[in-house]
Amino acid sequence: MNLMRTAMLLAFMTVLFMAVGYVIGGRGGMMIALVIAAGMNFFSYWNSDRMVLRMYRAQEVDERSAPEYYGIVRDLAKNAGLPMPRVYVIDSPQPNAFATGRNPENAAVAASTGLLHSLSYEEVAGVMAHELAHIQYRDTLTMTMTATLAGAISMLGNFAFFFGGNRENNNPLGFIGVLIAMIVAPLAAALVQMAISRTREYSADRRGAEICGNPLWLSSALRKIAGAAHVVHNPDAERNPATAHMFIINPLSGERMDNLFSTHPNTENRVVALERMAREMSTGSTAPVRPDNAVRKSRSVPRTGWGRGGSEPPKGPWS
């Protein structure tokens, strides 16, 4: 199902490229756009994960540089029966996280320093379990490729304004066609992102709760992240809005409503579903993830101290 969805999305993106190419240069422009789209599809499949990580200047960490964060992901991946993904930290005060990669064997998870600062051990585990669920369901291929292609289509729509209205080109639609392309192409690209059903977030929430062993860990994390995400701005996400749907909570300011134009379900609806799941679960489908040595250390996140100084008291029942 996910492979079919990915193919349909890529086909639609290709049609968008061809349509804008037609506006810019007629049939010749359409054929050039087709070649460019085919090349981008190929490139995105192999490189879109690296592109997204580079957009956010993500820093890869390991067991030595971020032992507790890395250990959480390692234990959760084992619970889920997944290969160990690459683990990254994003230097951003906004609490958020995402996963990327074309398949479970080539996947990566990334959490912001803001998330690692403000959440307890259990809440971090709930968030990373959610991201691993996306990897397990292979949502990451669709999300990452859609992000890169949607951004490119928006740029191509703007490109049409400078080169599509010239009388000397082969544009059969004139300046009106260029204006339509400028408006429709970015809107259509955004709608494609929304076409990736928001129900995948509910599915990842449920599977993530199973992986970490406690739905309330994730519900508590979602409340904290949503409360901060629209107060603490994320400049990198604002510059790259096509990647917003990849995050566990929409990182863009002003995206609060569960409506047709939202990339994420309403957070409170997700929390209610998780709390209902918690009531239904007598025991977790997997053993809850617990640290071997439940004491946060200053080296847990590179150069950050993972949220508190050495004199600050421990937080959470894991401490």
Swiss-Prot record:
Region (Disordered): 280-319
Membrane-spanning intervals of the chain: 6-26, 28-48, 145-165, 172-192
Keyword Oxidoreductase in record: no
Residue positions of the active site: 131
Essential cofactor(s): Zn(2+)
Swiss-Prot/TrEMBL GO biological process terms: proteolysis
InterPro entries the record matches: HtpX_protease, Pept_M48_protease_HtpX, Peptidase_M48
Co-factor remark: Binds 1 zinc ion per subunit.
Taxonomic superkingdom: Bacteria
Subcellular location: Cell inner membrane
Enzyme class name: hydrolase
Chief site of localization: membrane
EC number: 3.4.24.-
GO cellular component, one term: plasma membrane
GO MF, one example: metalloendopeptidase activity
Membrane topology: Multi-pass membrane protein
Keywords, in A-Z order: Cell inner membrane, Cell membrane, Hydrolase, Membrane, Metal-binding, Metalloprotease, Protease, Transmembrane, Transmembrane helix, Zinc
Pfam family, one: Peptidase_M48
Membrane is among the record's keywords: yes
UniProt binding sites for Zn(2+): 130, 134, 201
NCBIfam families the UniProt entry points to: PRK01345.1, PRK03001.1
Family the entry assigns: Belongs to the peptidase M48B family.
Name of this protein: Protease HtpX homolog
Organism: Sinorhizobium medicae (strain WSM419)
Gene this protein is translated from: htpX
